[in-house]
A protein has these predicted regions:
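Conserved beta-strand positions in the central sheet of alpha/beta enzyme cores
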Residues: 31, 57, 96, 138, ...
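N-terminal substrate-binding region of glycoside hydrolase catalytic domains
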Residues: 21-37, 59-62
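Histidine-acidic metal/acid-base catalytic patches
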Residues: 1-2, 9-23, 38, 91-93, ...
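Active-site acidic/histidine proton-transfer and metal-coordination neighborhood
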Residues: 49-50, 70-169, 252-261, 276
Length: 276
């Protein structure tokens, strides 16, 4: 099982420094934050070669594909097309989509059904474009404290059905499932082959074993259903505000400690069986 980590959790250090740390910690690759103004595909490919890493996926910056404001949706359309082009240029990494983080209710004068309709209409041409560029898409299921649109695996599977494209799959995250799913293992099982990516963090958004989430049954379910990977750890340094990577003190040492524990736990969990 290949393991990755979200680059945004390393904060404002350079991408090269981030890749150095990721490689040293024993990861196979990264989920790259989609800040397209900060680096080129050629630069990223060079870092991958230098540090023997892959870019498994791209996570989007701030945009609102379900906004009642057409100009917001147009900006999101351009951004995601650029992100898909970037993913194509580096070899076809998955592109993650989700609603605008922090918008936890419909905009004034709007409602959930209307904005859901905007999202479906937005995704159809984006999926078609991604298919042309041979770039897989995953829609990340966020908890209700981050987004009002898609909060459960069931809702995401319905979204994919309404969009009508096999190019789009589900991204389930253990941290969000701990909040929204009555049974995360069941959510994984019901998603089945529609699972395109899996994120993990414990209940407190720390590393594996730092909270109270029952992660072991989820890992067993992933193995049972033949999920090929990767597993992406999205666990910033512990402290106030889980959306901000930089915490008081030496946040990078704190971050690397919990990532190291998580890598060890996952390597042990998914180690190949030894023949007797």
């Amino acid at each position: 099982m290949k393991l990755g980590v979200c680059t945004w959790t390393f904060g404002p250090i350079s991408l090269e420094n981030t890749f150095e740390r990721v490689s040293r910690l024993g990861f196979d690759g990264v989920e790259l934050h989609g800040d397209l103004e900060s680096f080129t595909p050629e630069y990223v490919l060079g870092l991958c070669q230098k540090h023997n890493l892959q870019v498994f996926s791209l996570t989007p910056g701030d945009c609102d594909p379900a906004s009642p404001d057409a100009s917001d949706r147009e900006a999101a359309d351009k951004y995601y097309r650029d992100l898909i082009d970037f993913a194509h240029a580096i070899g076809g990494a998955r592109v993650s989509l989700h609603g605008l983080v922090g918008r936890i209710r419909p905009s004034a004068g709007s409602d959930h059904a209307t904005e859901y309709g905007y999202l479906v209409e937005f995704l159809r041409p984006i999926c078609a474009y991604a298919a042309e560029r041979q770039v897989p898409l995953v829609f990340e299921v966020l908890n209700r404290y981050e987004s009002h649109l898609i909060n459960t695996g069931e809702q995401c599977r319905q979204l994919i059905k309404d969009v009508g494209s096999d190019q789009l799959k589900v991204l389930l995250d253990a941290y969000h499932m701990n909040i929204e799913e009555a049974d995360p293992v069941k959510a994984l099982a019901q998603t089945g082959q529609q699972l395109g990516l899996y994120h993990v963090a414990d209940s407190n958004r720390g590393g594996i074993g730092q909270g109270h989430s029952a992660l072991q049954p989820q890992f067993e379910q992933l193995a049972k259903m033949g999920y090929p990977g990767p597993i992406i750890i999205e666990a910033p340094a512990m402290g106030p505000d889980p959306f901000t990577p930089v915490k008081e003190g030496d946040y990078l040492t704190k971050l690397e400690h919990q990532l190291s524990l998580s890598v060890t736990a996952l390597r042990e969990q998914f180690a190949p069986a030894t023949a007797i």
